[in-house]
């Protein structure tokens, strides 16, 4: 008999209904649940899939380089980064005739093109690329790496090259190699690239394969390194009148601590960044030699954890048993990795705009907005995933005997206290913040704006002042010119930093007031509620008072019949599902706040944000409605303009989002009945009844329909906001 899909589950393959297809897709990547899976094969499958993932990433980045080199205007943009719009790629078939062709022919192109809002032009320019040939070379190299990754994935599935389980569980060796190799060596290599290629390029010197052995990155070569006079590398930095990409006003320093931004490019000094990466490299190279492997020196992680028993006795046996628990649970490890990566991704969003690393990116407002929003949404999905896998760990991998009275067990023991405290914090934040907003709304509606409750964020202003912002008049730490902190740093990084933090044209430590105070607490409400749902889902994943045997039902189940008084919607999967809505909601508020504050900053009318952000009607009218007007005008009775594609995407995003509700609100019996009726009609309709199917059509399960609804809701939500964000920003600033 021919094998039916899914091959990995023969039980499912014999299912006579369409459930076979959907459940097959849903469990395709759940290797643990597959037939004939062994621990060894599980680890090897995951290892091989990592190579596939790398191949896709390299192929994608190669495609970016290739299309810009082929259809972009990189060489023209390099001549005038502030006034030429960077082109991502051509549009082969612009719909709606001649007006569309004219609307999308821009950036100096001969035909219709898409403008790049990803920041790649600024990035490539900063790291020293200058010509299309450079881009093609990079594309080819990445294509080669992609092929290499695919070969690597295939190779490690061959019997001779398959790693053993013991290799995957050798935590110390893996940590050493990842710290030293992945972070240490790559940071050192990047420092090398910045010093040998990027910094010379910023000073008008082109270093390529044909001359990189002859061009000294520093006039004194390696002399200062070997004689210990490292300070020579910091002497004679680029001047404040330096024109980026030319020798005019340039210096010779390669590793500096200037602080602040390059006046022309509004980005961090390249020599500061080279210094930063060198420091990171040294730290990680040392860190990668700390753990005990073949040589009997260094720390054993197990010994470290076993010794972590807080003396007060309040955490019981502390970290005893954790080493084996974590080392034997892929879900625990994935949860930790996702939690870390989620935080890092959000930090990337925050730092890319406040401390721009790429030349001229700070003046490309649409790109700034797009990159901030992009990284915050990705961070949200990654963080919710961390809790999902944490919950799966508790269901599949947690062993109570191994973890008796340690920190994990004690988390489970006092989960009621954790959940109720989070619940209390969420309720407090929600009612107080909404109360303030609604009060202010009513005052505005009744024509008495002076009766609003406006709270100055004095603690946050004090913290900003401590970092050197002088406009609040606090005179503390770095904003106090007579203090020791101020005097200690005056000769090195401080002048540049203080100039930057008190310069009103950048996004460093923006001035804050009552509107910021309110939206800050709205975002805090979103964060705490999302966390509450996720934490409760993970801590109750094994069982709750209502359903002590929950772990026996697995990660996702709809209900356990009518018998116990309501066991629907309490699986760990349901918690994840609910949390994603809150996560999207929260990031909506975060991005609205960021975008509105920056639009007013860039337009020079910050008072609009300050005055309108203290009540809900202000947000709805002066941010959402006001900024969607250009977008909605992408098509109108008089024709179309270059925003029409975003107008279409805005409508399409709403459609996808609304489709989600069809799956989220409708119930299963209704769909089953509808499907039976449609199937009956199909089988009795001439011509149509020539097409038959083997599987009996059945409605999606409750959990599946929720997943499909959630996917549509999320995708539609993000598409809608992306179109709004890009159109409203590019419509104003080009």
From Swiss-Prot:
Family from the record: Belongs to the PsaA/PsaB family.
Source organism of the structure: Lepidium virginicum
Enzyme Commission code: 1.97.1.12
Name of the gene encoding the protein in the UniProt record: psaB
Topological relation to the membrane, as annotated: Multi-pass membrane protein
Entry keyword annotation includes Acyltransferase: no
Function: PsaA and PsaB bind P700, the primary electron donor of photosystem I (PSI), as well as the electron acceptors A0, A1 and FX. PSI is a plastocyanin-ferredoxin oxidoreductase, converting photonic excitation into a charge separation, which transfers an electron from the donor P700 chlorophyll pair to the spectroscopically characterized acceptors A0, A1, FX, FA and FB in turn. Oxidized P700 is reduced on the lumenal side of the thylakoid membrane by plastocyanin.
Domain of life: Eukaryota
Record-listed chlorophyll a B3 binding positions: 662, 670
A biological process from GO: photosynthesis
Binding site for chlorophyll a B1: 654
Reaction catalysis annotation: reduced [plastocyanin] + hnu + oxidized [2Fe-2S]-[ferredoxin] = oxidized [plastocyanin] + reduced [2Fe-2S]-[ferredoxin]
PROSITE patterns membership: PHOTOSYSTEM_I_PSAAB (PS00419)
Transmembrane regions: 46-69, 135-158, 175-199, 273-291, 330-353, 369-395, 417-439, 517-535, 575-596, 643-665, 707-727
GO MF, one example: electron transfer activity
UniProt: phylloquinone binding residues: 671
GO cellular component term of the entry, any: chloroplast thylakoid membrane
Record protein name field: Photosystem I P700 chlorophyll a apoprotein A2
Record localization: Plastid, Chloroplast thylakoid membrane
Cofactor remark from the record: P700 is a chlorophyll a/chlorophyll a' dimer, A0 is one or more chlorophyll a, A1 is one or both phylloquinones and FX is a shared 4Fe-4S iron-sulfur center.
